[in-house]
Amino acid sequence: MQKTTALPLAILLAATTLTACSNGENNHTDNLKIFATTGYLADAAANLAPEADITTMVGPGGDPHTYQPTTHDIEAMKDADLVLWNGLHLEAQMVDQLESLGEKQLAVGDQLDEQDLLPWPEQGKGGEQLYDPHIWNSPKLWSQAVESIGDKLGDIDSEHAADYSTAADNYESQIAAAQDKAEKELATAKPRVLITGHDAFNYFGKTFDFDIHATDFVTTEATKSATEISELADTIADKKVPVIFKDNQANPQAVTSLQQAVESRGWKVTVSDEELFADTLGPDAPTDTYLGAFEHNAHTVAKALS
């Protein structure tokens, strides 16, 4: 999607809402309209409300950290019955605008217990503690996010609240089964060090006992310094890590530079042929769903470190 450089989102949202009201328009249909900032959230919504009309803001390969909404996004948010966003500063460019949507928005990460979240090295504008927003890589936290989505759907559409609750329970059972399968696959992986292109896998590391390092930090536009790359190359060579995992958002130049730095230290490290899925899902099945992407990531790591 193209980036917009027009009026601020909050102003445009207010303007389009006033226009709709003044014209007496009613854009609602029998199906709920759900706007989701990420594919992970859109997939959760589809599992809980399969009849809903769902719009995904950031598609495959996009970066929700830096994404700026288009006019089409603004219209879709205005028309939606429910706007789902990750929160925890993932959608860093549009936090105020999303919060301005009032009761019809839900930041799923903000519903979680801070004690379960991993700290983030950066601070907020007011100096407040930030937390790692990549919660979908923790099956436990993502199940809690699914639960909160089910509750919100029940609030919006109380007639079908029991259906949403049942669907959430069923989906959470599938997530738990995927975690069990991943634990078995990853049990013998060695060394327990995961080198990725994008800094999105810390919850994966916490869940499955991996030490996580990334060539990019926070966003696809924020690369590590030469000193940090050198230190990471030392770690890879010292621990004899056999593979660097590229992902669908990584900076390939950073991955190549790291590989060369490792080889200069006398250790040969390969770059995985199979990419991991970081902030977005894949364009095709099976990685176009949360479960598909999660299982793919676990299997790819297990195979490469077997």
What are these regions (language model features)?
Residues 3-9, 20-306:
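Extracytoplasmic metal-acquisition and chelation regions
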Residues 15-18:
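Bacterial Sec-type N-terminal signal peptides, specifically the leucine/valine-rich hydrophobic h-region
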